[in-house]
Amino acid sequence: MSYKFPYSVELETKPDFEESMQRVYAWYDNEIIDRVPVRFSAHNAEYNVVDHTNRWNSQKERWFDAEYHVSKYLESVKGKTFLGETFPVFWPNLGPNVYPCMLGGEATFGDVTTWAKHTLHDYEDMGKYRFSPENEYFKKLDEMTDIALEMGKGYFTVGYTDIHHGPDCADSIRGTSELCMDMYDEPEMVKKFIEQCSADFPRVFNYFNDKLQKNHQPSVTWINIPSYESFHIPGTDLAAMLSREQFREFILPCLKEEVKVAKHIVLHMDGKGVARHLDDFLEIPEINGIQWVQGVGDDEPILQWIPLIQKIQAAGKGVVVDLKVSELDAFMDAVSPRGIYLCISTDDTEEQKTILKRLLQWK
């Protein structure tokens, strides 16, 4: 099995880029070449690092310092070699609420993330939440992308930002409690607002994806799974608050449209609340795989979720799974490798090499 790619990516930090992409593309097709893909980084690892540099007048000013963030990432990858399917990717990041902000929403900036301000108090005002290419967040992401494309040559690839549109965007602007109550009191207005929060998503996605493609950059974002064509990771976090019936009424129609935007689709399924809708996810043919985020505390260890993982495998979908190093052997004994894409948190190069050898034996 061998895939032909439209262009080559030459990086001194990732000399085996094409070999790794062969494994990724086999995974998209629910196949295995020699071993399962493995990324040596945990989900949300970037949000555990606080930047103590203090040269800005506000948190927003720090987040908007495009050259600083690209330079910082460049320095972090120089001299390193990325093993497995760990790809050096800089993706422009203005926080998880950047898409609502592109529509005219507002956010509070913190050290490692942002929080949406719930600014919609009356649906009569929802018309003001519209995308504009003159929006400061969109323009800053564009600037950050251009700087990264120039500075990253030979060191890293460039991705696109985290995009939460549709229901999650409406949730950010309206507020979770209010939106959920509105589903009972004003269901048609909720549907109309969700539709409005989805309308410009293809335009924004295609703008950045086209820019990456023109610069021979794979399509990739925060989850670090690239595609030579187009990749998107839908998220449906609001679904954790909804019944199966509400999900099908308010979220599923939007999701079925969202997955049409890209060739390769991996659904972000965050926690058991969202997982109650798994049967609906598995019926969507465009979804290649599901990223399962089991959570912490009582939701650990991963072995309690083996039946859920096997259900996804049985449906012919891939599964992206976060593992601790200590869980690897038991996990390998419990499930088939077919469809598995591992994320393992370890910075130890020798440990990474040992894991890669171990995975070659997983049949």
Residue ranges and their predicted role:
Residues 113-117:
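Short acidic, low-complexity segments enriched in Ser/Thr/Gly/Pro
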Residues 1-45, 50-59, 70, 76, ...:
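Active-site loop segments of alpha/beta catalytic cores
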Residues 118-126:
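Residues forming anionic-ligand binding surfaces in small-molecule and nucleic-acid pockets
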Residues 96-99:
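Short, compact, well-ordered microdomains
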